[in-house]
Regions:
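Conserved active-site and SAM-binding loop architecture
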Residues: 1-134
Length: 134
């Protein structure tokens, strides 16, 4: 005889035929993904939108810790700066960094490349204001 708990009655077993394609807008650290994981729902990290780079770094550390790919390896420093500028990254969640700010000595080339790699690893579309339908 199997023992059941009250949680077995509160949380039904999810039955899906295909993994859920999770799209997280204003993703933060990925609470939606954590909830699906904790409920045992099969899902894939399909897309996310989070422009705050500290949150994106946390998201990657929590959900894609094994992805150590250097997506910026074939890019020059200038290409990385241009890509981050076009994506509209933020460090305060209130306004995007300007190209001059991204280029400044406040942010090292290593930091810029880490940001770019985190964006690519998490399938991050970054600034929701610049998204367009296809």
């Amino acid at each position: 005889m199997d023992q059941i708990s009250m949680f077995d009655l509160m949380y039904p077993t999810f039955k899906t035929y295909n993994p859920v394609r999770l799209i997280e807008l204003f993703a933060g650290v990925g609470s939606q993904a954590m909830a699906l994981r904790n409920l045992g729902v099969p899902f894939e990290h399909y897309l996310m939108s989070e422009w705050e780079m500290h949150a994106t770094a946390s998201y990657k550390a929590i959900h894609m810790a094994d992805d150590d790919t250097d997506y910026s390896a074939e890019m020059s420093s200038e290409d990385v700066i241009q890509a981050l500028t076009q994506l509209g990254i933020s460090v305060d969640g209130k306004k995007p960094l300007t190209e001059e700010q991204i280029r400044s000595h406040s942010y090292s080339d290593a930091w810029r490349r880490e940001c770019y790699n985190n964006i690519k690893a998490t399938h991050n579309l970054v600034n929701i204001c610049s998204m367009r339908g296809g």
